[in-house]
């Protein structure tokens, strides 16, 4: 794969008003994508966004670029990333575009693409788009210019799709659920899905103003959700991030239920119902408690690099259907082509309803190991992880932790940091081992 100039692992992303998140670059990107994506099909591209104020500016610029290349744009407005993937497929569009920076603050934004089948664009297509970005723009003839339409019922279509993944003979009647939408793209979707399935819903994070997305709310800050669950005596709480591809849950006692626990609940229920295909893909950061719990059920487990795109790659390689990260990206390929927070929450709720068990009860089978995470800064130059003393200590600790913990040492790809992670049944021991490793790295 050629080295990328503009596209990162998740499209183009950055601070609004600074290259490449500017209207002039977005226009050029729309044009370049339009030139590459134009085929003999519908010549239509679906455009969705989250609730950032900059989304208005960027979608207009993208639409102008697409039109100049002869492609029409179909706007769906604020819409979760997985919804855009789904709607791109059902509208038979050439591609889907999402304007979002996921869990980042409002002053960041990004642009990423889905192929016609709702999956990440192939590398060769992204490379072809990049090559055009450095070329002067040309335009189709006036009678070939693209148009723009707005799809007013997109939210309703996705709500019905989500509800259709929930067992037809089940209901959420009797459940009180607090739903935190991070003032993001799920604000008009998730509460309605839960209500229409019968739940009593208490909303927080559902009043976006363009500036408050992910601000002290959502999957990256669940303190408000925990308080709301306890205050309202709810059965559980659900938090999504700004673009709806990540989920964290809270049980009735206010305890956090992370992506590893959610993944286990879904996997166990799929096994019970005979719908589990293959095994489960986690990441290098997945808790050892998840691995052990899956092993007790004889469910195969493998680890991908950190990042939902790497989880997806492993799933496709193994032809498995279920994977995710402890941060809350949960991919259920039987239901959607990308991580989908609403679908994941419905999978957990279906398991609760099937067994008439609380979320707290369902998490008991996957006791998470205490995990210590430390960052150590170093002065460029030699990689401390190649130092003989550091390697010897790491090997010694790994030997001591066999069967009851693990360590993970990795160099940051963006800054001069070594990330140290130690998991152990004994929290005190985990902290001790982590500090020993940090000391060795600092003294290398």
From Swiss-Prot:
Q: Which BP terms from GO are recorded?
A: carbohydrate metabolic process; peptidoglycan biosynthetic process; UDP-N-acetylglucosamine biosynthetic process
Catalytic residues at: 102
GO CC, any one term: cytosol
Q: Does the keyword Acyltransferase apply?
A: no
What are the UniProt keywords, alphabetically?
A: Isomerase, Magnesium, Metal-binding, Phosphoprotein
- Name the Pfam families for this protein: PGM_PMM_I, PGM_PMM_II, PGM_PMM_III, PGM_PMM_IV
CDD domains referenced in this protein's UniProt entry, alphabetically: GlmM
The coenzyme or cofactor needed here is: Mg(2+)
Task: Give the cofactor note.
Answer: Binds 1 Mg(2+) ion per subunit.
Q: Which residues carry this modification: Phosphoserine?
A: 102
Q: Name one GO molecular function term.
A: phosphoglucosamine mutase activity
Report the protein's function.
Catalyzes the conversion of glucosamine-6-phosphate to glucosamine-1-phosphate.
Matches recorded under NCBIfam families: glmM, PRK10887.1
- This one is known as Phosphoglucosamine mutase
Tell me the classification of the organism that encodes this protein: Bacteria, Pseudomonadati, Pseudomonadota, Gammaproteobacteria, Pasteurellales
């Amino acid at each position: 794969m050629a080295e990328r100039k503009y596209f990162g692992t998740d499209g183009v992303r950055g601070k609004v008003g600074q290259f490449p998140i500017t209207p002039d670059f977005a226009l050029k990107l729309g044009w370049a994508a339009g030139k590459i994506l134009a085929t003999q099909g519908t010549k239509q591209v679906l455009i969705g966004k989250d609730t950032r104020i900059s989304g208005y500016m960027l979608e207009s610029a993208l639409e102008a670029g697409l039109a100049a290349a002869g492609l029409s744009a179909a706007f769906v407005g604020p819409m979760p990333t997985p919804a855009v993937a789904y709607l791109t497929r059902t509208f038979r569009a050439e591609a889907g575009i999402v304007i979002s920076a996921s869990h980042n603050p409002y002053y960041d934004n990004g642009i990423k693409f889905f192929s016609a089948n709702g999956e990440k664009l192939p590398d060769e297509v992204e490379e072809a788009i990049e090559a055009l970005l450095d070329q002067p723009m040309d335009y189709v003839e006036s009678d070939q210019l693209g148009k723009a339409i707005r799809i007013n019922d997109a939210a309703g279509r996705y709500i019905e799709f989500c509800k259709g993944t929930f067992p037809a003979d089940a209901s959420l009647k009797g459940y009180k659920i607090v739903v935190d939408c991070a003032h993001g793209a799920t604000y008009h979707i998730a509460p309605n899905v839960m209500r229409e399935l019968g739940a009593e819903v208490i909303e927080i994070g559902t009043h976006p103003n363009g500036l408050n997305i992910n601000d002290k709310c959502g999957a990256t800050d669940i303190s408000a959700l925990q308080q709301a669950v306890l205050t309202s005596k709810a059965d559980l709480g659900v938090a999504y991030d700004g673009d709806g591809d990540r989920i964290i849950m809270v049980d009735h006692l206010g305890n956090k239920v992370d992506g590893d626990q959610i993944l286990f609940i879904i996997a166990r229920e799929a096994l019970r119902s005979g719908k589990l295909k293959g095994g489960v893909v986690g990441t290098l950061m997945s808790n050892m408690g998840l691995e052990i719990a899956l092993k007790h059920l004889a469910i195969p487990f493998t680890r991908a690099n950190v990042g939902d795109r790497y989880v997806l790659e492993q799933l496709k390689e193994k032809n498995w259907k279920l994977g995710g990260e402890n941060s809350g990206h949960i991919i259920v390929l039987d239901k959607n082509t990308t991580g989908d927070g609403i679908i994941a929450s419905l999978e957990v709720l279906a398991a609760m309803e099937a067994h008439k068990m609380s979320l707290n009860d369902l998490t008991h089978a996957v006791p998470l190991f205490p995990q210590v995470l430390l960052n150590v800064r170093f002065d460029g130059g030699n990689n401390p992880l190649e130092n003989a003393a550091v390697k010897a200590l790491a090997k010694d600790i790994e030997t001591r932790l066999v069967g009851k913990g693990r360590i993970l040492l990795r160099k940051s790809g963006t800054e001069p940091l070594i990330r140290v992670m130690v998991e152990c049944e004994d929290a005190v021991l985990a902290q001790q081992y982590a500090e020993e490793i940090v000391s060795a790295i600092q003294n290398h």
